[in-house]
């Protein structure tokens, strides 16, 4: 399941992010890639230890935590601290699959990567290329969203960032360990939750069938959650 979360950041917030990132310290992205990924990774990455990176990643996490669509679709248990990258002058990230398990920085915890996420910080009209290409069961999906919007997709997907041939593509990226490991089960829970919300608006929260479906949702969560 691919989920688009529009306008996680407002236009004003995007401008604040990009102005701050223009002044940040950028490093060769290969330094943070695994042995296989480093062979196909050509981009720049914001210094993770900088005060700017810490400030911006905290803002992203705060916005995610307050977004109902993100919470419903991802069912997050842990969120890997968001990172920031940029591509320009033909830079790209070749076809790869993200690591299955990652250590969370500055902790003794590990994170299972159930979902990958990209928060676009550049408007599509400001750069050529740079599509996030994801191989799905329905074929190749080419993703290029408005600045401030997020794409969530299964972390076991083969994907790549196409070469940026003009302008600059800046983004934040991160991973989520979900309470529900299975993509299929998580997708069913999301559909059920969206239906419950729609029926609640139409019939009210005290409707017997709304209550029944809500009970089904929570019982499925109880059966499938891995926390």
From Swiss-Prot:
Gene3D superfamilies: q2cbj1_9rhob like domain, Rabenosyn, Rab binding domain. It comes from the Bacteria. It is an enzyme of class 1 (oxidoreductase). One of its GO terms (biological process) is DNA damage response. It holds the Pfam family PKHD_C. The keyword Iron applies. Residues 78-178 form the Fe2OG dioxygenase domain. The keyword ATP-binding does not apply. Disulfide bonds: none annotated. Fe cation binds at residues 96, 98, 159. Its cofactor is Fe(2+); L-ascorbate. 2-oxoglutarate binds at residue 169. Keywords: Dioxygenase, Iron, Metal-binding, Oxidoreductase, Vitamin C. GO terms for molecular function: 2-oxoglutarate-dependent dioxygenase activity; iron ion binding; L-ascorbic acid binding. InterPro entries: Oxoglu/Fe-dep_dioxygenase_dom, PKHD_C, PKHD_hydroxylase, Pro_4_hyd_alph, Pro_4_hyd_alph_FE2OG_OXY. Its EC number is 1.14.11.-. Binds 1 Fe(2+) ion per subunit. NCBIfam families: PRK05467.1-3, PRK05467.1-4. PANTHER family: PKHD-TYPE HYDROXYLASE YBIX. HAMAP family: Hydroxyl_YbiX. This is PKHD-type hydroxylase Patl_2273. It comes from Pseudoalteromonas atlantica (strain T6c / ATCC BAA-1087).
């Amino acid at each position: 399941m691919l989920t688009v979360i529009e306008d996680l950041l407002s236009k004003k917030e995007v401008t604040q992010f990009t102005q701050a990132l223009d002044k940040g310290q950028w490093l060769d992205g290969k330094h943070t890639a695994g042995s296989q990924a480093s062979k196909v990774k050509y981009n720049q990455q914001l210094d993770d230890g900088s005060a700017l990176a810490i400030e911006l990643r905290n803002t992203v996490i705060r916005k995610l935590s307050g977004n109902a669509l993100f919470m419903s679709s991802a069912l997050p248990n842990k969120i890997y601290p968001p990172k920031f990258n940029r591509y320009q002058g033909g830079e790209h990230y070749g076809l790869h699959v993200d690591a299955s398990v990652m250590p969370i920085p500055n902790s003794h915890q590990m994170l299972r990567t159930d979902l990958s996420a990209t928060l676009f910080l550049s408007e599509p009209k400001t750069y050529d290329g740079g599509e996030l290409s994801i191989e799905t069961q329905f074929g190749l999906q080419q993703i290029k969203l408005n600045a401030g919007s997020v794409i969530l997709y299964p972390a076991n997907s083969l994907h790549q960032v196409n070469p940026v041939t003009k302008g600059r593509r800046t983004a934040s990226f991160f991973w989520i360990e979900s309470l529900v490991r299975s993509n299929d089960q998580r997708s069913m829970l999301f559909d059920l939750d969206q239906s419950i919300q729609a029926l609640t608006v139409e019939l009210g929260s005290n409707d017997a069938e709304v209550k029944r479906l809500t009970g089904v949702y929570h019982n499925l969560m109880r059966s499938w959650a891995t926390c």
